[in-house]
Amino acid sequence: KDSTIAAALCVEALGADRVIGVMMPQGHQKDIADAIDICRFLSIPNLTINIGSTFQTLCYEIDMAGDADHMSSMEPMIKTNLPARLRMATLYAVAALYSNSRVVNTSNLSERYIGYSTKYGDGAGDFSPLSELTVREVLMIGDDLGLPYDLVHKTPSDGMSGKSDEEKIGFTYDELDKYILYVEDGL
C-alpha cells in the first residue's frame, strides 16, 4: 500500500511522465503483479529487475569469506534485511540512468515510530511523502485518490518473509496509530 500511494502522490505532483515504477522481485514474488497493475492504473512506465540471483550470489560469497571463529553464517534476520539494501542500491542505479532522478522513500510515520525499517534499505530515499502520516492517514489518502481498494487495503508485508507486518511486530497498525495519536496529540 505504501508504494502504491507514494507513487500516486508523485504522479499527482510531478505527472505520470516523470515517475517510474521499479519492481525488484527476489526470485518469484506474487505481489509483483499488483505493482504492475498499479503502474498501469497510474499510466507510469515500469521496470522489473530481479534481484534473486544477486541475493543468492552475495549470500554465498559472504558465507565463503567468513572466518568460522569470528563470523557466524548468514542468520535469518541478516538474510531478511539484505534484499531491502540490494533494492535501494538498485533504485539509485536506475535513478542515475534517468537524468539523476530521485528515489522515493515509502516509509510512513507508524513504521518510523517503532523503527520498523531496514537501515540503508527501505528506510532510505531522497524524499519521504508519507513520513508524517500514520497508516490510517495513508489509507485515507489512497481512498481519496481513487486508487483500487484492494491495492490500498492489502495486508502489508515485506514480500519476503511470508509474514504480514503486523505478525512480525506483534500488534496491529490500528493499535499503533491510536497509541501515536494518544502520545503525540494527547487524544
Regions found by a protein language model. Give the residues of each.
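Catalytic subdomain that performs nucleotidyl-dependent activation
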Residues: P76-K79, P83-R85, S99-E175, L181
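ATP-dependent adenylation/nucleotidyltransferase module used to activate substrates
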Residues: K1-Y113
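Short, intrinsically disordered, charge-balanced linker/junction segments flanking boundaries
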Residues: E184-L187
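Charged/polar, solvent-exposed surface patches and flexible loops
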Residues: D37, S53-Y60, M140, H153, ...
